Design a protein with these regions (language model features):
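A beta-strand edge to alpha-helix "cap/lid" segment located at domain peripheries
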Residues: 1-26, 33-137
Length: 137
């Protein structure tokens, strides 16, 4: 089951890299209880507001490339999966290549109707004094 949570996490970052709101919609739970905290943003509550935040991000930033490191995954009662990781990100922002690091916590809930893990919480915090890992890009 841990591998299933890690696969759901990979789907989340695939959606990000592909700048795909459709893929992002597929991995998030659609209710008013989900939460997203992007680095430097206020807390966003509810799927519709979270969807709008992804639309804004996808409009302003392109060509995301993620290298995920330092992954730690835990399961609670086979219903909740918590994954922490470092997002090593390369992107194009305002015509410039940018490298940044974000420590992320992604919480997944098992959806028995869909028989899969869906993200219910994402929190990203910037890494100060970030140095990308060797060979990450």
């Amino acid at each position: 089951m841990i591998k299933d949570v890690e696969n759901a996490n990979a789907e989340f970052y695939d959606a990000f890299e592909n700048v795909s709101i459709n893929m992002m919609e597929n991995i998030w739970i659609h209710n008013d209880n989900c939460i997203c905290i992007h680095p430097g943003w206020e807390m966003i509550v509810g799927w519709l507001a979270i969807r709008e935040s992804w639309m804004t991000i996808f409009t302003n930033m392109k060509n995301f490339k993620f290298t995920i490191t330092n992954t730690k995954t835990r399961l609670y009662e086979d219903v909740v999966g918590v994954l922490t990781c470092v997002e090593n990100i390369q992107m194009i922002q305002n015509e410039r290549k940018v490298h940044t690091g974000v420590v992320a916590t992604n919480i997944f809930e098992y959806d028995y109707n869909q028989k899969r893990w869906l993200i219910v919480y994402h929190h990203g915090s910037p890494v100060s004094d970030y140095l990308p890992p060797a060979n990450s890009y």
